[in-house]
Structures are given as C-alpha cells and as structure tokens.
Regions:
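Sec-dependent N-terminal signal peptides
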Residues: 4-13
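Pan-zinc metallopeptidase signature
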Residues: 5, 156-181
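N-terminal signal peptide c-region/cleavage motif recognized by signal peptidases
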Residues: 14-18
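Auxiliary, metal-adjacent structural segments of Zn-dependent hydrolase domains
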Residues: 20-81, 90
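Extracytoplasmic/secreted envelope proteins and their assembly/folding machinery
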Residues: 34-37, 102, 117, 121-124
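Active-site recognition of the HExxH zinc-binding catalytic motif
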Residues: 99-111
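Post-HExxH zinc-binding segment in Zn-dependent metallohydrolases
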Residues: 112-150
Length: 181
C-alpha cells in the first residue's frame, strides 16, 4: 500500500512539475537570457512567465542608444511585444538579467503609468532581494548599485508599510516628464 501511495505521489509531482514548466525557448534563443529565465522559474517567479506568455513576449539583448536605459519594452514590425535588454549588460550576472526581465514583464500597457512602473520596479527589487546570493561579490556597476538601492527601498517599504519605490519614481525628473506629474 505504501508503495502505491508513493508511486501516486511521484506521478502527480512529476505531472504538476511538467505542467508548470515553461518552454523557455519560446521566449528567447539567447543562452544568458535562458539561464536568467530558468533562475526565475526555479525561484517560483511564475507571475513573470504568466505575463510573458499572455503577451507572447520575446526577450533579447539589443543595443539601446541611451546608455542609461537598462531595458525597455518595444514592439516588432508585426506588433508583438519584445523586451530589449541593453546589450551593455550582456556580461552582467544572470541574477541581474533575471531582475531586468522580471521588471519588464510587468509592463503591459503601451505607455507606462506610475502604478505600472511602481509594480515593475517593486517586482525587480523583490527579485534582486531573493536572487542575490550571500557571499558573492557582484561587480560594482551602475546596474548593481541600482538593484541594491531599490531592493533596500523595497525591504524598507515592507517593514514599515510606506511605498518608498513609488515615492522615488514619482519624484524622479525622468518619470515626472514621462507621466506628466
């Protein structure tokens, strides 16, 4: 009887795992991006994949002429959504690439709003807080500093109930002009 129950449990576990697994290659062909997506999947970031799948999104590295842009959402010639990760971050740690994907996956509107940007940045920050490995020395790049900063804002927001990420975005001159605040 125990063997039958164990067999049934193994069968259901395998079946559920396969049902939840995403075909990551449907999102990208780049090995670094696929590794980042695998890391997101292994850490239970299923919301990221639900957003990507719902919107049939592709993810790729792309030379973004503005070096201060980490990643962006765009549309291809067929109207399909594409997440463009600035190619200057191609050598960034896979955990950081995963955070950029998580952020951009939250954007669904053609024009971002304060609420959407806050959700996206909060998702990016929570992913970094989860994925950043203790004891690993990450390169002190602009991206690392940004991720550390927003992760600290996210943690502080969770601790005291204030939304420091939204405050930071709302007070940013870049976003003030973008959102007409």
């Amino acid at each position: 009887m125990k063997k039958v129950l164990v067999g049934i449990m193994v069968f259901f576990t395998f079946t559920i795992t396969q049902a939840c697994a995403y075909n990551l290659k449907s999102f990208s062909s780049d090995s670094k991006i696929l590794s980042a997506m695998q890391l997101l999947e292994q850490n239970g970031e299923y919301e990221v994949f639900a957003n990507l799948k719902k919107n049939a999104v592709k993810v790729k590295f792309y030379h973004l002429s503005m070096s201060n842009v980490y990643a962006a959402n765009a549309y291809d010639e067929f109207g399909r959504r594409v997440i463009l990760i600035n190619s200057i971050y191609k050598d960034a740690p896979v955990e950081q690439i995963a955070c950029l994907i998580a952020h951009e996956s939250c954007h669904t509107a053609r024009k971002a709003t304060l609420d959407e940007e806050t959700r996206a940045t909060s998702k990016e920050a929570s992913c970094w807080a989860k994925l950043k490995r203790t004891g690993v020395s990450y390169p002190q790049t602009k991206l690392t500093k940004r991720l550390d900063k927003i992760a600290n804002l996210h943690i502080a927001s969770v601790e005291d109930g204030n939304n420091y990420i939204e405050d930071k975005i709302a007070n940013s001159s870049f976003y003030k002009s973008q959102f007409n605040l």
